[in-house]
């Protein structure tokens, strides 16, 4: 089991890429082994306590980005489906307890990790075809922790989720329209030097330009779509994405949460976002009247 004081945790945060990769491979092998599939919620909390500290010890920008991407990929590629909800709960449970201990020098890298975790949850749901039960489990975890109706969960962290939620959903569902040659770093990482390793890894995994359907390399430049064709394709994608179900817990927050400032934040940053109107999730007149 990973502990916050273990040498293994420090290897995950190591500046040497080979050392980091060996530690990450060891972690993924363990989680996919019979022993890993038997982990209980308490065990997963202990695991996340160790992973939390691996980010704590990670000091340089590129290793931080790499580690955040690797920890995010545990959600999209590693954890067995039957353990995913508990693994997700354990992540938030640890962050709920440890958030107030994060100093201003470490805050950005933890915000980046939250972004990666959200992104890779969306990648998993999208890859599995947005199955109703899996979406319901994902939403239930959000309602149980970051969107809970009391003051136990750090409000600043809930604010962050309101800020990034639609950005990350859009990043995932419209991945084929991203310009991989000019893709910029996320806003919270822009002050760091070096490349965004996780953006690179996402691009390699999800970039449709890398290979054709038969596994070969594409030849020449991809055919450029017109704005109308892009809009039509995006509309088709959104029609197949349960955006309303994914946004539903935020609607509940805006109506029932005790914290007035957070209710307003949720409305302004998410529910009033023009993208929801564009995607026909909310009616424009209805949004303005609220």
Spans of model-derived segments:
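Alpha-helical solenoid scaffolds in eukaryotic proteins
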Residues: 2-10, 29, 45-54, 70-73, ...
